[in-house]
Amino acid sequence: MKLFYKPGACSLASHITLRESGKDFTLVSVDLMKKRLENGDDYFAVNPKGQVPALLLDDGTLLTEGVAIMQYLADSVPDRQLLAPVNSISRYKTIEWLNYIATELHKGFTPLFRPDTPEEYKPTVRAQLEKKLQYVNEALKDEHWICGQRFTIADAYLFTVLRWAYAVKLNLEGLEHIAAFMQRMAERPEVQDALSAEGLK
């Protein structure tokens, strides 16, 4: 299978999940500004949405949207326990976090990355994100991972988005549980491999 990605983008969560799954895959970098692949091909021909991630399965099926890709990968390797079984409350708590990260955190950063966002609007965006990160920090207070004592795909997504918080220099002072979580994630070999493959540190 092939993962279409942009270094450091939200596709990093799917990349980490792929490495945690133990599956064989190849990486294809996408220039999202030009919508071109490494070889110059039109990315819209692969994914009409023009966004990453996209996962091309061996049978030719294309999956898009990171949350869907991560759940598919987790369910394909149940022995890895990246997502709890159907009908377990643990599974739905993980999905709850995936949705929160996608809608409240991930999309919350978008105005900070868009060059056309008015400068006077950015302090409000930053303040909203910092308030939400306080909630995340509190959720990690007594837990090793965001859903408890076992690593899940929600951790891969949370790690990816939290990296942006550091990149745009949000005020993370006093959020020691987030800092500890980021350190635990950085120590995972699969995370290290994903970051290295994307040329990140």
UniProtKB/Swiss-Prot annotation:
Q: Which UniProt keywords apply?
A: Cytoplasm, Transferase
Q: What is its main location?
A: cytoplasm
In terms of temperature, how does the activity behave?
Optimum temperature is 35 degrees Celsius.
- Please give a single GO biological process term from the UniProt record: response to hydrogen peroxide
Where does it live in the cell? Cytoplasm
Picking any one GO molecular function of the record gives: glutathione transferase activity
Write down the superkingdom of origin.
Answer: Bacteria
Span of domain GST C-terminal:
87-201
Q: What EC number(s) has UniProt assigned to this enzyme?
A: 2.5.1.18
UniProt-listed Pfam families: GST_C, GST_N_2
Name the positions where glutathione binds. 10, 35, 52, 65-66, 99, 103-106
Q: Which NCBIfam families match?
A: PRK10542.1
**Similarity comment text for this entry:** Belongs to the GST superfamily. Beta family.
How would you summarize the oligomeric state and partners of this protein?
A: Homodimer.
**Main function:** Catalyzes the conjugation of reduced glutathione (GSH) to a wide number of exogenous and endogenous hydrophobic electrophiles. Shows activity toward 1-chloro-2,4-dinitrobenzene (CDNB) and ethacrynic acid. Also possesses thiol:disulfide oxidoreductase activity, using GSH to reduce bis-(2-hydroxyethyl) disulfide (HEDS). Has a low level of glutathione-dependent peroxidase activity toward cumene hydroperoxide. Is important for defense against oxidative stress, probably via its peroxidase activity.
* Listed name of the protein: Glutathione S-transferase GstA
What species was this sequence derived from?
A: Escherichia coli (strain K12)
Gene (UniProt): gstA
